From Swiss-Prot:
Source domain of life: Bacteria
One Gene Ontology MF term: 4 iron, 4 sulfur cluster binding
GO terms under biological process: nitrogen fixation; response to oxidative stress
Descriptive protein name: Pyruvate-flavodoxin oxidoreductase
Signal peptide range: none
């Protein structure tokens, strides 16, 4: 559901975590569209702080945004 209703997905691979970040990255790479017919932008960051900044920036522009990290 989360992949389907977002435009920007910021991920930071960390252990342990849910497999959702990997799935979102794979779906976006395959060109799987969300409910609006666009492919969400998936960005992999280098830290959890980077994810927080990316999410904040995306939300400030009005994008529907989520993150998958610890």
């Amino acid at each position: 559901v989360v992949y389907q209703i977002n435009e920007v997905i910021a991920i930071y691979p960390i252990t342990p975590s849910s497999p959702m970040a990997e799935w979102a990255d794979a779906w976006a790479s395959e060109g799987k569209p969300n409910i609006w017919g666009t492919v969400p932008t998936v960005v992999q960051m280098q830290s959890e702080g980077g994810v927080a900044g990316a999410v904040h920036g995306a939300l400030q522009t009005g994008s529907l945004t989520t993150t998958f990290t610890a």
